[in-house]
Every structure is written in structure tokens, then in C-alpha cells.
Amino acid sequence: MIKIYAPASVANVGVGFDILGAAIIPINGTLLGDCVTVKLSKKFELINKGIFSNKLPINKEQNIVWKCWFKFCKVIKKNIPVSIILEKNMPIGSGLGSSACSVVATLVAINQICNNPLNSKELLLLMGEIEGEISGSIHYDNVAPSYLGGLQLILEDSDIISQKIPNFKHWFWIIAWPGIKVSTAEARKILPKEYKKDICIKNSRYLAGFIHASYTKQSHLAARCMQDFIAEPYRSKLLPNFLNAKEKIKKIGAISCGISGSGPTIFAISDKIKTAEKISLWLKNNYLQNKTGFVHICAVDVKGVRKIG
């Protein structure tokens, strides 16, 4: 029996639409992600547990975990019956890589129980393919950080899919999920099919600045460059009073703020714990829409997916 944990992630990181993603972990040690337990069995079995298990499809063949198992068996050309327990601790449609958590944890667990027939690159390609079926297009900005850890730059080259880039260890990432759902597929549909040249140049300039600042350890420059000209102008309307929240938490002292993935989770960054705590409190009191919403002060999770049992 193998138990695997895959962490939540912040896709896009503001400036890097479909290009950047960071795995995160609350600084209090809480595991923010999904867990999957797998053991060999006589037939395929799936049990759903966890806080958000009631949001999963009743039909097991519509469950992401079943799709992962089915695709894995197809790739290795063997039918391996397994018993799987999914602990669904990530809210669906939260903008924190919920589906990626399940995909990464499941594929790594099945691969390990089968003595690793797929290598790291093959697994990552399969993760991206399954994510694409869920969201409408193949993208790695959640699965790559959840799998590999750290802050990932998505290249999608035939030989190199993703590369880890330096992150600022003194940064606190405050993430707030308001307790409502935003469909990734719908959030993608709202974006324009084409962008003006000046917007593309501006976004490229800031993305290049962020990468440069990350490697040269200029944290303030990196924070200034974390601006989203591609998705935020359109997706902000899907979030509860996002622009007001962004203005307020920047006044409190956030050095950056943006939409996590497709939303509705937002992230803010502070380089001081006291400021992070003030931002966290404001978000709890003003951004959460119901009792299921949450706020966490996080750091970048450099480990990524891991065996915990």
C-alpha cells in the first residue's frame, strides 16, 4: 500500500499566464492538497473521502482518479486492478490546482505500486494530457509545480517540459479561497482569442523582468513585475469584488496581489510576517463569502509530490 500527497499550486503567478506555477504549503505545517492511497486488488475500486468528496461525481468513470488509472493502463498496455482511496481535501474550481492535485497524486501512486514503468517525463506528459481533458486545453502550470515542487517555468518543449526557477524564501504567500466555484473551462472561454501587439510586448517585458529578478535575487523588482495583462482584466469580474480587495490589501502592505489560476482564489505576497497576518485577517473578514472559504499564509513548497505512507 502506498499513500501519496500532492500540494496545491498557484498557477500563472500573475505575470506568467500558462507559463508559471508555484507549489504552496501553509507555514503552520498543514497539508494543503489531496492524498491518494493505492494498493493492488482483484478489481478496480474507488473510495472518495475528505472535506470536498461530496462534490465529486457519483459515477466513478467520471472521476478524475478513474481517468488517471484508465489512461495509465492504456499507456503501459496492461490492466492493473487497484484499490484507490482519494482524500479530496481541495475545493473543486478553486483556482488552486484541485484537479492537478488529484491527477498528480493518483498517477504517482499507481506508478509506484506498479514498480515505476513510467519515467518522470512520461508521467508529466500524461498529467498534462489529463489536465487538458478537464480544462479544455493542455497546460502544465498546476501539474508541474504540484509534481516537481517549487516555482516552475513551463517550456512545453519536446525534451524539456518544465524548469524550476529560484523563488524568494522570505516571501509569504497569502491565499484566500472565498468558498465559491469558478470553472476553469469557463474562465478560459471568457478570454479573448487574440491580443493586441502592445499588450503582448508589455506582458513579455514584465515576464522577462520577473525571471531576471528571480535569478538576480531582486525581490522588489520581481514583485513589481508580477502584473497580469492577459487574464486579470477579464477574469476579475468572476471574483467577488476583486479590485476592491486588491486595493485594500496593497494598502495594508502587500508587495504583489493577483488571481490564482482561474480564480476565485486570490494570492497576495508580503515579505513581513506581521503584514501577512494583517492581510490574512482582512481577507477572512472581507473576501470570504461563506464558512467553507479559507485563508492560509503559505510558503513555496519545494518538495512537490511525496510519499507520506
From Swiss-Prot:
Catalysis performed (reactions): L-homoserine + ATP = O-phospho-L-homoserine + ADP + H(+)
Subcellular location: Cytoplasm
Pathway entry: Amino-acid biosynthesis; L-threonine biosynthesis; L-threonine from L-aspartate: step 4/5
Listed GO MF terms: ATP binding; homoserine kinase activity
Predominant location: cytoplasm
Keywords (A to Z) from UniProt: Amino-acid biosynthesis, ATP-binding, Cytoplasm, Kinase, Nucleotide-binding, Threonine biosynthesis, Transferase
Gene Ontology cellular component terms for the protein in this record: cytoplasm
Residues engaged in binding ATP: 91-101
Keyword ATP-binding: yes
Family: Belongs to the GHMP kinase family. Homoserine kinase subfamily.
Chain's role: Catalyzes the ATP-dependent phosphorylation of L-homoserine to L-homoserine phosphate.
Protein name: Homoserine kinase
Species whose genome carries this gene: Buchnera aphidicola subsp. Schizaphis graminum (strain Sg)
Lineage: Bacteria, Pseudomonadati, Pseudomonadota, Gammaproteobacteria, Enterobacterales
